[in-house]
Curated annotation (Swiss-Prot):
Name of the protein described by the UniProt record: FMRFamide-like neuropeptide FLP6
Acetylation is among the record's keywords: no
Phenylalanine amide PTM positions: 11
Organism of this sequence: Penaeus monodon
UniProt subcellular location: Secreted
Lineage: Eukaryota, Metazoa, Ecdysozoa, Arthropoda, Crustacea
GO (cellular component) term, any one: extracellular region
Main location as per UniProt: secreted
Family in the record: Belongs to the FARP (FMRFamide related peptide) family.
Amino acid sequence: DGRTPALRLRF
């Protein structure tokens, strides 16, 4: 995913 490190845990 190309999202933030924190949100990567969920998304």
